[in-house]
Design a protein with these regions (language model features):
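N-terminal low-complexity, Ser/Thr- and acidic-residue-enriched intrinsically disordered segments
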Residues: 1-32
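Intrinsic-disorder-associated interaction segments
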Residues: 2-6, 88, 95, 193
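Sequence-level motif detector for i,i+2 pairs with an aromatic at +2
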Residues: 8, 46, 155-156
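A conserved cap/lid and substrate-binding interface adjacent to the catalytic center
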Residues: 20-117, 143, 150-152
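Serine hydrolase/lipase
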Residues: 104, 108-113, 131-219
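Gly/Ala-rich beta-loop-alpha elbow adjacent to hydrolase catalytic centers
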Residues: 117-122, 126
């Protein structure tokens, strides 16, 4: 039976992930954390995996030109290099290597997540790790990590919640999301960092109040 999680609570946790253990709610639930180059992840009691990304992305250009330093290798997110994951799925190479650092850490620590929550770069990793572990996940402000489109195994377990005014969610342009994508139209567009979790929490409230978004995932 799949673990079920409140979408609003998941958004709160995603925002809190940028504060780490200084956030009281995370500190109480904290089991372990990873902070290695450009890769961060938090493993919480209840076997919840939390993956922050970029809460301060201001625009399309800054995100598209971002360079990740992973294991001494540099990956530019605007590159279209791909690589097959262990499942045989073809992913964006930079996103895949980011997710693999988290996977290797989980394996070393013998942690197995029951639910995965990620934002931004962490939302790309969420999609990949949902495919790996076969557990539900919510990806906020999700870029596109997958080369091809269409359903694959476990894709029904992944929910991508994207604001329709967040250009990061359309990157890289020739790639695709995994799972169900909920494009949320905000009552009012934000000038500046509409990519941040603060603005995602607001649009989730609006969408749920209007009956456009379920309260839980899986719904």
């Amino acid at each position: 039976m799949s673990h079920r999680y409140e979408i609003k609570l998941a958004a709160q946790m995603a925002e809190a992930s940028y504060s780490g253990r200084s956030n009281a709610s995370l500190a109480a639930a904290w089991r372990d954390g990873l902070d290695q180059h450009d890769v961060q992840a938090i493993f919480l009691k209840g076997d919840i995996l939390l993956i922050p990304g970029s809460n301060s992305v201001m625009d399309y250009l800054k995100f598209n030109l971002r360079v990740l330093n992973i294991g001494g290798t540099r990956y530019r997110l605007s590159d279209e290099h791909t690589e097959k994951g262990a499942s045989g799925t073809v992913w964006h190479q930079g996103f895949l290597h980011h997710a693999k650092v988290i996977y290797d850490w989980l394996e070393r620590q013998r942690y197995k997540p029951k639910f995965i929550i990620g934002h931004s770069l962490g939302a790309a990793a969420t999609q990949i790790l949902v495919r790996t572990y076969g557990v539900p996940g919510i990806a906020f402000a999700a870029p596109r990590p997958r080369r091809s489109r269409g359903a694959i195994k476990h894709s029904e377990l992944c929910l991508c919640v994207n604001r329709d005014d967040d250009m990061v969610c359309d990157l890289p342009g020739t790639f695709h999301h995994m799972g169900r994508v909920h494009r949320a139209r905000a009552a009012r567009s934000v000038f500046g960092p509409d990519h941040s979790m603060k603005h995602y929490r607001k649009v989730i409230d609006e969408q749920q109040t209007g009956g456009h978004l379920h309260r839980h995932w899986p719904s």
